[in-house]
């Protein structure tokens, strides 16, 4: 994948970093709330356009997100996923995420960095 665009935002709750692939086919956001979760970055909005899926782009974007977590001295990465999206839950497990909690709608997962 070519270079990615990183954009950092400061919010009242912390900081977020947006990562977009150079061709615009994929993006991910990593949020840091050091008051509530001082050692865990939160990965959200990982998306790949449908025509570019199953080519490793999502894995590369996730690696960028995990690298950003490490750069911010996080020791864990967290995310939520729709519990009905079995394929995606299994994909996150293959990437090393483990179940932290669940309710009837979503699964919270965590990965040690």
Question: For each of these PLM feature ranges, what is it?
Answer:
Residues 1-45, 49, 64, 68, ...:
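Acetyl-CoA-dependent GNAT
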Residues 27-29, 53, 80:
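Short, conserved structural micro-motifs that define repeat-unit consensus positions
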Residues 48, 54-67, 93-94:
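Conserved acetyl-CoA-binding loop-helix of GNAT-fold acetyltransferases
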Residues 59, 71, 83-101:
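Conserved active-site alpha-helix within GNAT-family acetyltransferase domains
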Residues 61-62, 74, 109:
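Methionine-biased hydrophobic packing positions in alpha-helices, especially
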Residues 69-80:
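Conserved GNAT acetyl-CoA-binding A-motif
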Residues 79-88, 106-110:
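Conserved beta-strand-loop-alpha-helix junction that forms the acyl-donor binding cleft
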Residues 98, 104-113:
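Terminal substrate-recognition subdomain of acyl/acetyltransferases
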């Amino acid at each position: 994948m070519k270079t990615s665009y990183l954009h950092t935002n400061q919010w009242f709750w912390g900081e977020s970093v947006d990562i977009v692939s150079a061709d615009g086919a994929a993006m991910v956001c990593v949020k840091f709330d050091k008051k509530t979760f001082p050692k865990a970055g939160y990965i959200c909005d990982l998306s790949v356009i449908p025509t570019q899926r199953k080519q490793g782009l999502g894995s590369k974007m996730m690696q960028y997100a995990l690298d950003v977590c490490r750069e911010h001295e996080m020791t864990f990465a967290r995310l939520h996923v729709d519990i009905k999206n079995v394929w995606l839950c299994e994909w996150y497990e293959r990437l090393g995420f483990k179940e932290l909690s669940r309710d009837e709608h979503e699964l919270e997962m965590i990965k040690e960095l």
